[in-house]
Each structure stands twice: as C-alpha cells, then as structure tokens.
Amino acid sequence: MVEKIDFVVAWVDGNDLVWREKKAQYDGSINTFKEGMNSEKSYREWGTFKYWFRGVEKFAPWVNKIYLVTDQQKPSWLDINSEKLVLVDHTEIICNDYLPVFSANPIESNIHRIPGLSEHFVFFNDDMYLTAPVEPIDFFSEDGLPKYVTALAPITTERYGTGHFQMNDMGIITSHFSKKEILNNGHFFSFKHGIKQLIKTLLYGTTKFICGFWESHLPYPLLKSTMDLVWEKEKAVLETTSASRFRSPSDTNVWLFKYWQIASGQYAIGNPKLGGLFSLDNAGPDFWKLLNSGKYQIMCINDGHNVQDEEQVMTDFVKAMDQLLPDKSSFEI
C-alpha cells in the first residue's frame, strides 16, 4: 500500500496585469502557426480554481501534500499558511535560461523536480475537478503502480490541438519499445478497460505500427522515478521542450511519462467509470445537473473554443460548483 500520495496542480492567472506585461515582452516570438496554440483562451481564468481545492479537501482528505506550481502568482483568496499546501515557483523546477515560459509543456516536463515531492503523485490540470469521493486505490494499485484506462487509438490531427505533442510522445515510445513489447506489456486486451476501449484496441491492434494511445484527459498518477528515467534516456528532447517558451509543434507533454508506464507494463488498469472529459461548449441545464449528480468522481471541464455566451456560462459554472462545494476549504482565507 502506498503510504504517501501528493497532488500537483499547475495554475496561471491570465488576467494578472503583471503576468500579461511579462508575456507581452515575448509575444513577438510567436509565429503565425503557433498563434492558434497560444490564444488568450489558453490562459483564461474562470474564477473557479477555489473549487478545485474544495473538491480535494472534501473528496480526498487523505492527500499528503498539495503542490501548487505558478509563475510568481497566487490566488488572492489562497491561505499560503495552510498545512498541506506548498507553493512552487517555476524558478524552482525549470532552468533559469529557459524562463519565463508561457506553456504548460515545459512545466509538466519538470514537475518531478519539485523539492520534497513524493515518489507517488497525481498531476492535475486546473480544469480537473474532484466531484465525488476518491481513494488512493483509484490512482495507484496496492503495490504502487499508477492506474490508467487505455486503448490503442489513432492520434487526432487538429492543426492547433494536442496531436502534435502526442505524435512526439509516441515517437519516443516506439523508439524504445517495439510493437510486440507494447502489446505484450500494455494489458490492452482486457475487459477491465471497458468495452469501448477494448473495441478500439481490437480495431487498431492489427495495424503494422502502434497508431497511438487513447487519452482520457483525467488526472495523471505518476512516479517520480519514471520521470527521472525518461529524462535520462531523452534529455535532449526534453530540454528542447523545457526551452519552448510558448506551445510549439515540436513539444512533448506530460503524457509521455504516462505512456512510458503503459508501454513498459508498469501500470495497473484503472476504473473506466472514474471520470470523464466535458466541454463548456456544450454546457447547459443537463450538464450542470450532471456536475452535481455524483455520477463521476472526477470531471475534466474543458474551456472549449466555441462557448457562445461566455459571461452566462461563467455565471452558470460558478453557480453549479457552488452548489456542489458551498463550504470554504482550509486553503481559503
């Protein structure tokens, strides 16, 4: 049984004028192709981050430490004296030569450098909310392996999407593991992943090459030692990502470390019903009811790029979260 599990979450306040001025000094380095990958929506702050902390305190009180990774920022409501909270600045984990960075990819690639971080930790994006009780066994097996639901699936090729990063991640994986090794190690042909994922694997397992891994967009249980290992084997690539001030098609991302666990067989199969990915593009009365229903323990609520009435959606989002998590957490002033 894993004794200590930490949570790590990265956050940026895109409304902060000091941060915006700093970013503006480097915006000229963004070429036309990269503009779509680094739009204002990538940094938008909806004012819902306090509910992330409320969810953790209510639904995962067993967590050891929470490491909040920021760029010299902190939410105005945050109690920095909270016993479980540790603020981590980018300067503590990323080489000064590469700073400042305005992309999640360099940050995610260096989170294992957080001073004091436990071997077993779960990395969250700030749009991944706990919405019902979770236990350590939801993230790690009794013998300490990270738990994932996966499948063989093609990589989605959107011009400004994450497919570029996933292609780079998988290129590294397939350079270290053969198709035979991946299929033998990966536990893909198991009903435990869920019937939908098994069907994907059966469809794409017959191709000549590994086409990609299905991505759940849920929090990432990771091992610090695995990140060290991948850095040891792919230092040049990861240094390039670390030096990428803005999102670039040449980047890798945090999925690389998860994929390494899968390809090497160093993972256990998770619960396919643990959570889901949702977009605010489709937010309406039914979605807000779902958020409060307890059907999912974890919900990744993505900002989306086609929200029609942003002000109304933001109001409804905050209202729904306040219904689910009305009480202040110990992390709030």
UniProtKB/Swiss-Prot annotation:
Q: Which InterPro entries match?
A: Stealth, Stealth_CR1, Stealth_CR2, Stealth_CR3
Q: What top-level class of enzyme does the UniProt entry assign?
A: transferase
GO MF, one example: transferase activity, transferring phosphorus-containing groups
Q: Which Pfam families match?
A: Stealth_CR1, Stealth_CR2, Stealth_CR3
What is one GO biological process annotated to this record? polysaccharide biosynthetic process
Q: What is its EC number?
A: 2.7.-.-
What is its biological role? Answer: Part of the type 2Gn receptor polysaccharide (RPS) biosynthesis locus. Essential for cell surface RPS production, and for synthesis of the host-like GalNAc beta 1-3Gal (Gn) motif of the RPS. Probably encodes a 1-3Gal alpha transferase.
Question: What more is known?
Answer: The cell wall polysaccharides of some oral streptococci act as receptors for the lectin-like surface adhesins on other members of the oral biofilm community, especially type 2 fimbriated strains of Actinomyces naeslundii, allowing colonization of the human tooth surface. Recognition of these receptor polysaccharides (RPS) depends on the presence of a host-like motif, either GalNAc beta 1-3Gal (Gn) or Gal beta 1-3GalNAc (G), within the oligosaccharide repeating units of different RPS structural types. Stealth proteins are part of a protein family that is conserved from bacteria to higher eukaryotes. Family members were first identified in microbes as proteins that help pathogens to elude the host innate immune system. Microbial stealth proteins are involved in the biosynthesis of exopolysaccharides. Stealth proteins are predicted to function as hexose-1-phosphoryltransferases.
Q: Which family does it belong to?
A: Belongs to the stealth family.
Name of protein: Receptor polysaccharide phosphotransferase WefC
